[in-house]
Amino acid sequence: MTKPDLASLEKTIDKAFDERDGINTATRGEVREAVEQSLVLLDRGEARVAEKQADGNWQVNQWLKKAVLLSFRLNPMEVIKGGPGQSSWWDKVPSKFDGWTANEFEKAGFRAVPNCIVRHSAYIAPNAILMPSFVNLGAYVDEGTMVDTWATVGSCAQIGKNVHLSGGVGIGGVLEPMQAGPTIIEDNCFIGARSEVVEGCIVREGSVLGMGVFIGKSTKIVDRATGEVFYGEVPPYSVVVAGTMPGKNVPGENWGPSLYCAVIVKRVDEKTRSKTSINELLRD
């Protein structure tokens, strides 16, 4: 789709979102067509909610988030087939794989293990592997990435190339508030088992999060070597583990509860990262 076509689509979506109180399952015409077209573009990876710019910053295409939100108003609940034991689900969003045959899977080029769930409008790039996991609408999973068992990729989350999301990892979805950016995991990152990255935080390229690291917008991310504290973003090629920081003393006492933080235990360059095992990086 050309830039003028995208601009026209964006204009229609923006206007419809401003007038969303009047949009419902009976709405037809230009608005419905624009929303459906937007979701197809997301599903094919021809458009994405956020795009990395040359300066390293991420540009968020808020109109595509609006299209996703409008789809909830437009689409009625319906039976979704494919449940265990020939049962069904009851939802507004069909499976990405609805109606797929071997031909569609071969063209898509990724591996979808039984019991993985991907909702329509999420993009999965070639050579990705989906274990029994959940990928929500509007998300983008790039080439060579492994989404391991029971991992969750939230709505509109952006997952880079050659990322490993270990078992039980949660990557938070961000649809609202509208001004919030999506959660982003850049290329060549490793996210350890049962870790959570949420609230539009960014894990920059080449970083390693150990098992059980939780990062939200208010989480202190402390560089042990410098004392520098980051919020909402893990710097590139950081090795991060769960830790604690001293808290304030309780009234009348000389002690207080420690508070959770994430600790950058080391930083490595790209060459070291590519040649060193994850276990070696985390051993300190």
UniProtKB/Swiss-Prot annotation:
Predominant cellular place of this UniProt entry's protein: cytoplasm
Binding site for substrate: 111, 148
Top EC class of this enzyme: transferase
Lineage of producing organism: Bacteria, Pseudomonadati, Pseudomonadota, Alphaproteobacteria, Hyphomicrobiales
Pfam families recorded: Hexapep_2, THDPS_N_2
Catalytic activity: (S)-2,3,4,5-tetrahydrodipicolinate + succinyl-CoA + H2O = (S)-2-succinylamino-6-oxoheptanedioate + CoA
Enzyme Commission no: 2.3.1.117
Source species: Brucella anthropi (strain ATCC 49188 / DSM 6882 / CCUG 24695 / JCM 21032 / LMG 3331 / NBRC 15819 / NCTC 12168 / Alc 37) (Ochrobactrum anthropi)
Protein name from the UniProt record: 2,3,4,5-tetrahydropyridine-2,6-dicarboxylate N-succinyltransferase
SUPFAM superfamilies: Trimeric LpxA-like enzymes
